[in-house]
Amino acid sequence: MKRDDLIFDIIEKEHQRQLKGIELIASENFVSDQVMEAMGSCLTNKYAEGYPGKRYYGGCEVVDQSEQIAIDRLKEIFGAEWANVQPHSGAQANAAVFLAVLNPGDKFMGLNLAHGGHLSHGSLVNTSGIIYTPCEYNLKQETGRVDYDQMEEVALREKPKMIIGGGSAYSREWDYKRMREIADKVGAILMIDMAHPAGLIAAGLLDNPVKYAHIVTSTTHKTLRGPRGGVIMMGKDFPNPWGKKTPKGEIKMMSQLLDSAVFPGIQGGPLEHVIAAKAVAFGECLQPEYKEYQKQVQKNAAVLAQALIDRGFTIVSGGTDNHSMLVDLRSKYPTLTGKVAEKALVSADITVNKNMVPFDSRSAFQTSGIRLGTPAITTRGAKEDLMLEIAEMIETVLSNVENEEVIAQVRARVNKTMEKYPIFAY
């Protein structure tokens, strides 16, 4: 068979882009060779509808083993009693929880998307906001942190069936204990989407929501540094509170509802090659060097945030507890949009994404902010000294967004600097 040079040339172009640039998108990371190897394995050939030991296809004895290892390792990392590793993505994991917990039209509550929430937590263009009825809580304008008092007020008034914690652009620790107290007051299920800080939580550097929430979802990429995918967990299984029964008349456990919501609810056959790669990544999470990596992610984020503050940038909430930060450009560059800032930085081979900031006056297509994160650059071996350089280069570019010569100089500096850093240093 003739090799598809067209596609493989494109893949090599992307490889070179990743090698030469500084990756600061908070949701991106670089996987190890063994994770990549598992993803590209012959397991991609196997159909395996169902779950280990209960499949709808024959010949699943081998993939049963790799999927069970993924489940067991994930449970060990987070202290969970039950886990499902089949969701194809974090959004799919969230959609499965919605299907298990809510009926169409039911009310739920999540963080305002414009304040750092995620589109799968109630955006009106996402299934979560189309099929179900969202209400929202916000950040405090003066602190840039979650307003738990307002969350409680909204919960008591709206009586949501489910409350969601977690977001895509929130740099601070969450008060899971308070959220559980609020959920219990109104009889709601508490779901925590820990997709962004999951790796830091796995390393014990941030509080573990599995101890507090009824249900926890996550992606397996981002800080967790695995393949692209999703998972669902529970600290403790429990009988479903709505009295749903098995054909034998027994009350179904919540794990049964969640398993059924993933398959056959929203997915068919699982991606067993990706699940094997998840298992490999979870094995890496259990190694001592993984905690050292996550400590460096956290250190690098704190140093980068402070270096930007020292240069006159505004960081929402004044800093970061995790791997990420949201830069409000308005104070330093009043006329500069996130869209223009992103384009200029990408031209200098510094990859970021535009992002709305709390109480933004601009649209989601323009924005007044950019989001930055340190997981990927830390995987390449970066330490605090490089963060100081990066802050300097960001300021140089954003002060010269229309000066192609300056941007070219920064790009050359970025490319030269990154020659010293492998894609995967751990």
From Swiss-Prot:
Its EC number is 2.1.2.1. Pathway: One-carbon metabolism; tetrahydrofolate interconversion; Amino-acid biosynthesis; glycine biosynthesis; glycine from L-serine: step 1/1. PANTHER family: SERINE HYDROXYMETHYLTRANSFERASE, SERINE HYDROXYMETHYLTRANSFERASE 1. Belongs to the SHMT family. This is Serine hydroxymethyltransferase. It comes from the Bacteria. It is found in: Cytoplasm. The record marks 221 as: Plays an important role in substrate specificity. Homodimer. It catalyses: (6R)-5,10-methylene-5,6,7,8-tetrahydrofolate + glycine + H2O = (6S)-5,6,7,8-tetrahydrofolate + L-serine. The lineage of its organism: Bacteria, Pseudomonadati, Bacteroidota, Bacteroidia, Bacteroidales. The modification N6-(pyridoxal phosphate)lysine is found at residue 222.
